[in-house]
Amino acid sequence: MNKDFNEFKKFIYNKKVAIIGLGISNMPLVEFLSNLGARVTGFDKKNENELENNINELKAKGVNFELGENYLDKLSNFDVVFRTPSMRTDHPILIKAKSEGAYITSEMEEFIKYCPAKLFCITGSDGKTTTTTLIYNILKTEGYTVWVGGNIGNPLFTKIEEIKKDDKVVLELSSFQLMSIKEPIEVALVTNVSPNHLDIHKDMEEYIKAKKNIFKYQRENDLLVINEDNKITKSMEEECRGRLLKFSMKEKLKEGSFYYNEDLYINEKKVCNVSEVKLKGMHNVENLLAAFSCVSEDSSIDSMREVAKNFNGVEHRLEFVKEIQEVKYFNDSIASSPTRTLAALQSFDRPVILIAGGYDKKISFEVLAKEGISHIKHLILLGDTKYKIEEAFKKVMRDSSEDLPISICNSIEEAINIAKENGESGDVVTLSPACASFDMFKNFEERGNKFKSIIRNL
C-alpha cells in the first residue's frame, strides 16, 4: 500500500519549490504544485521565447522563473528541488542544494511513492516502449482502467487524484529516472540490458546499477520479470527480493513465458502461434513474451491472444510509411541503440538500404557491423556518428570477404535521395539510426516525422 497523497499535499503547502527543466513532464508540475500552495520557481536553460509553453498565466499566479544561460545561478535556499530526469543526481547544483537542507526529488519519484493503483514498471535497453504499450493494451482489453506514463503518454503525477485503487498504471522508466528511485514497485520488468547512454552514465556498471533500482526496493510479494536469454538480466535473479518470473525465446519454462515450436506460451499454456502475431520481427515476439509474464496474474489468455493478433505497433517503431515504385519505406526512428537497429534489420527477409547515424552516446558499433553487415544492401550514414559507424563497418570488411557500399551525407533529405536513387524493385529502405537524435533533432519523434513527411511527398 503506497502513501496517502494527502500527506504530500500537507508537506508541499507553502514550501519554497524549485523545478529544474520546463519540459513535457515538469511544465504541468509547475502549475500543479502552485495550485497546492507551493511557492514555485521554474528553472530552464531556454529563454522565454524558446519555451514551448506560454508562461504568462503562471506568472500571474505568482510562479517565478529563472531562464537562460545562467539559469541555475539563483538556485539557492529552496525547501524542495524537483530535478529533470536527464540531470545527474550528483550534479554540483543538487549537491549544494542538498547541503542547504533541500529535499531533492523528481516527478516520477513522487508519483511512484503516492500512486494508489497497481504499478507495472518497465525498463531495459531495447523494447521498452513496445512492451509498455503491449502491457497497457492487454490490461485494457481485460477491462481495467489503465494509465500509461513515464517516457510515454502524459505526466501522471498531476492526475494522481483521478487514479483509483482498482486501476492499473503502466510506466516506461529510463535509467535516468531510475537513478534516484527508492520506492517498491509491484511489477518490475527488465526487458534486456546492453551498452547504452554511456554519454550520461560514468560507465556500464553505473548504467546497470540504475536499472536495478526498478526491483531493489521490492517487497516479498512484489514481482520481478527478467529476460532469461540476456546475460546481464539473468544475473539479476540473484538479487531478486520478491517473486520471480522469466521469459525466454530459447528455453521452455515451467513458470513464465516462452517460445517453442513457433508457439507462444505463458505458464505452459499456449497463447497463440507466431503466424498469428501482427507485429513484425522476432524481437517483437520477445516483447510479447515479456508482456505476458508481467500481466499473467491480472489477465486472461484470451486478452493476451487478442492483443497479439491485433496490435500493429507503435509510431516510429518499424512503421511502414509508403511504397514508391515497388520500394517499401519504413520508419524506425525509435532505434537509438545498435542492438535495436540490429533487431530491425533481422526483421526483414532481405538486405535493406539502411539510413543510420546520429548523436554519439559513446557506445560501440562493432556488434552492429559484425552481425548486421549481411542484412544491409547499402549503408547511408549521417549525423555525429557517421564516420564512427563507417569505420566499424570498414573494419569488418577488412577482416572478412564482405563488401558493402557506404554513402556519407549531411542531412536526412540527402540520405533519402541517395536511398531513392539506389532502390530497386522489391527493396526495403529503413531509417533505423542506432543513435539518439539530439545532434540534428529535438527528439526521435521529430526525426521520424521529418522522415515520413519527406517520403510521403516523394
UniProtKB/Swiss-Prot annotation:
EC number: 6.3.2.9
GO biological process: cell division; cell wall organization; peptidoglycan biosynthetic process; regulation of cell shape
Gene Ontology CC terms, in alphabetical order: cytoplasm
Enzyme class, UniProt record, top EC level: ligase
Catalytic activity of the protein: UDP-N-acetyl-alpha-D-muramoyl-L-alanine + D-glutamate + ATP = UDP-N-acetyl-alpha-D-muramoyl-L-alanyl-D-glutamate + ADP + phosphate + H(+)
Coiled-coil ranges (or none): none
Family matches, as InterPro entries: Mur-like_cat_sf, Mur_ligase_C, Mur_ligase_C_dom_sf, Mur_ligase_cen, MurD
Gene Ontology terms for molecular function: ATP binding; UDP-N-acetylmuramoylalanine-D-glutamate ligase activity
Highest taxon in the source lineage: Bacteria
Function text: Cell wall formation. Catalyzes the addition of glutamate to the nucleotide precursor UDP-N-acetylmuramoyl-L-alanine (UMA).
Family: Belongs to the MurCDEF family.
HAMAP family linked to this entry: MurD
Protein name (database record): UDP-N-acetylmuramoylalanine--D-glutamate ligase
Organism, as annotated: Clostridium tetani (strain Massachusetts / E88)
